[in-house]
């Protein structure tokens, strides 16, 4: 392989990998843990606006999150269905609110190199899946979620 061909292949690999990164401003992502996906409960459901893990199936907007950069490597997560933001709620449960103005509601995604990310807030809290149909809670330990681009 010539030097020119090698450079071309390397360039494709670098830019191809960069375009696959789901973590960027205004990107739409889905956050999952095994066969469960993070979603926002809707008005009319028990505990509306709380964030729960439900079985994967057809991808809907209540499972989609839009990243909004707040500077540096932190983001607000806006639910595509409601337009509300992921925040820490009462008793360390995650829910959504009309604004994410507190720094503790700004999140960083740290890749583990396998397509999974530890999500941490500026207050060093980490969302943790507690299983099927349970609310997502804040934890002090790292927890790696699969983060993928939306299937739109």
Swiss-Prot record:
Supply one GO CC term from the record. Answer: extracellular region
Q: InterPro entries from the entry?
A: Ricin_B-like_lectins
- Cellular location(s): Secreted
Query: What residue stretch is flagged as signal peptide?
Result: 1-18
Q: Which UniProt keywords apply?
A: Secreted, Signal, Vasoactive, Vasodilator
Q: In which tissues is it expressed?
A: Salivary gland (at protein level).
| GO biological process assignments | vasodilation
Q: Which CDD domains match?
A: beta-trefoil_Ricin-like (cd00161)
Q: What does the UniProt function comment say about this protein?
A: Salivary vasoactive peptide; induces vasodilatation in bioassay with rabbit aortic rings.
Name listed for the protein in its UniProt record: Erythema protein SVEP
């Amino acid at each position: 392989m010539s030097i020119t061909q090698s450079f071309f292949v390397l360039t494709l690999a670098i830019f191809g990998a960069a375009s696959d990164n789901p973590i960027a401003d205004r990107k739409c992502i889905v956050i999952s843990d095994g066969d469960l996906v993070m979603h926002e409960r809707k008005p009319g459901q028990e505990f509306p606006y709380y964030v729960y893990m439900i079985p994967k199936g057809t991808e809907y907007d209540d499972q989609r999150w839009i990243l909004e950069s707040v500077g540096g490597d932190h983001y607000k997560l806006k639910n595509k269905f409601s337009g509300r933001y992921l925040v820490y709620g009462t008793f360390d449960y995650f829910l959504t609110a009309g604004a994410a103005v507190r720094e503790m509601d700004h999140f960083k995604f740290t890749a583990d190199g396998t397509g999974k990310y530890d999500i941490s807030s500026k207050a060093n809290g980490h969302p943790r899946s507690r299983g099927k149909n349970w609310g997502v809670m804040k934890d002090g330990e790292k927890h790696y979620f699969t983060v993928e681009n939306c299937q739109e």
